[in-house]
Amino acid sequence: MRTQPTPKLIVTVFAIALFASASAQSVGVHKLDDALDSIVSTNAPIETAAEGFGFTEGPVWMKGGYLLFTDIPGNVIYKLQDGNASIYMLHAGYNGPDMWRYGGMNDNAYDKSDPRYEEFPMIGADGLTRDVQGRLIIATFAGRSIVRIEKNGKRTVLADNYNGKKFSGPNDVVVKSDGSIYFTDTFGGLRLRAKDPKVELPYNGLYRWKQGKVTLLLKDEMPNLNGLAFSPDEKYLYLNGSGDNYVNRYEVRPDGTITNGKLFFDMRADKDPGVADGMRVDTKGNIYETGPGGIWIVSPEGKHVGTITPPQRCINLAFGDADKKTLYMASHTAIYKVRVEVPGW
């Protein structure tokens, strides 16, 4: 596995052979409803922005005009700017002894008969976001913590436990406009996952960090908690579970807690490869959700209006560029991008 890819020129993806992880659908934008026309064009080309990684995750656009993303097995955060990918941070996830004991095993989604197939422990960081001051927030996954990167580069651990019990693997993370940080904790940061003897919190949970205090918002209600996103008005929190392939919507109370969770849209009937993982929302409230067949675009009313199918199964995504109209898609070994009509939020 290469932990530092050779930067490649951006190329448009046309008809190509898909990986085993890709959808049965062809690469492109697929319309299910005319509402898609005002969101993204079916003629929008999907481009390769960078490639040669192990398992990319957590894309986030920074105010400095560049994209950051993680390569989990490489334990690296990369910076993508002007078509070039470079190392931004080493040891972004687990950064201690006995590294071989950490990180659940995964692979790069090639078929096992393919000579490019690789298995590896997921020792690096996972989700990334920015706080209201523009500082990088990291769900360190195998590092079992939420970390903030200060302006001088110092790492500040904001949270690594709940009531004295260590997290198992913070997965994805978002920031509310009041500065509070919402994140999911999973078993994926540990080698044996839920059966690992180092598990201290025997459930997947949704937490909120605010001014140094960690509050448990949800546990056991939804298995395999993973991706999350707020609606533009922050009245709702959307939440999915990895492998569960459905999304719930929760009302956000004035105090920041959540209530009245309901099924918002269900992807379980679709048998194409792909799972619910990363999620983003645009300024009109449309939800972009990874799932079977690619990235599902769902209206604020819960209607599936179209799917973006990149060459590889998408894991997470982010809006970027100056106008926030480029959707960056993190897959196993590459970062793809496509232009959309509505800016991200």
Language-model-detected regions and their locations in the chain:
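Intrinsic low-complexity/disordered segments
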Residues: 1-2, 22
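Bacterial N-terminal signal peptides that target proteins for export
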Residues: 2-11
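Bacterial N-terminal signal peptides
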Residues: 10-21
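Sequence-structural signature of mature extracellular/luminal beta-sheet repeat domains
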Residues: 25-345
